Amino acid sequence: MQTKSGKNNAKTMFGIDNIPVDNHVRNILDKIDPKSFKKIYEDILEECQKLKIINQFVFMKKYILVALDGTHYHSSKKVKCSCCQSKTDSRTGIINYFHSAITPTIVHPKVKNVIALFQEFISNKDGQKKQDCEVNASKRWLDNFNFFNQKYKLIILGDDLYSRVPMISKIKEKGHSFILVCKETSHKILYEQIERFKSANSHKTVTIEKMHNGKKQFFTYNFINGLLLTGGNIDNAEVNWCELIITNLEGKKLHTFSFVTDLKITLNNVEEIVEGGRTRWKIENENNNTLKTKGYNLEHNFGHGKQYLSQNLCSLNILAFLFHTIQELYDTLYMELRSNLGARKNLFEAMNILTSMFTFINFDKMIEFILISRESDEQVPLKDFILLN
């Protein structure tokens, strides 16, 4: 656009005077410590608090639910560095080198959107004998995240990998609570206790009738407080256990969900606690899956670099997703546009086409133009929205 008309959308929309070539950007990003982006994420969170966006995510009146999960964002069979993790194919012997990160996300059972937080990269260090892992990276993230300490208490959500004594101890050490998936196959001692309680009919239970897709289902909640996670006397954790069994009218079991938590479970709150635990799936569906398949292409190899390029490209990608989320939660014009266009990909494609053809007066004018063009049967006058030569 700059070459054709002497104007460009980077200048009119975002105030960028000089646009560097992509290789120059990569060279700059490669040298920047990834932790430098943390302050940007925190500034956005601070604005979310001022705008009361965070209020939508308050759970059980005083908590914020944060789901933890790991995801890959770069892989190659040739390009590698000292920070790469690796996995050897047992059949072919071929080594795959990859980068991954913990992508913490604020979630809420009643809110469609999620708020992405600053990542913790799973990264091998020089001299390290064992590869870094998801749990260790999650512990580091807990050590470094203290944004809500004064106002809200966090409830950490995680899959069965997290419901172990070391992780629970770290969560409690940082002053947080937890609702973690707890599978029978990996918690033998805990479930032996549960079976004893069930056999003696000493557990609490409540069944609620609900409608799902026009069909009646029964949600049965079972819970027991004050169990030991493992059999050890020293390295142990006291937990409260709950499960949800969903059955249909014929009594067929459709789904079972089970969790451990440090929150005291009662007949009045068991449904809400289980609902909070189940919200963990939003980190996979609304966060990681969106980043990979809905237009952000997180797993695409945008570049590896010699130092920090791949980490920083990952962080910037998630930052873009965060900005779009905040717009969707607060900006009425953007909300209307998303509702009108549906999938994010549709919006990205429309923007890509329009910005390659026209220089808009500003970002809002582009949004208005897309909306009016879709809603009006008459031709929209371009002069009201773009800069003319």
Model regions: which residues?
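Short, positively charged, Gly/Tyr-enriched micro-motifs
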Residues: M1-E42, I171
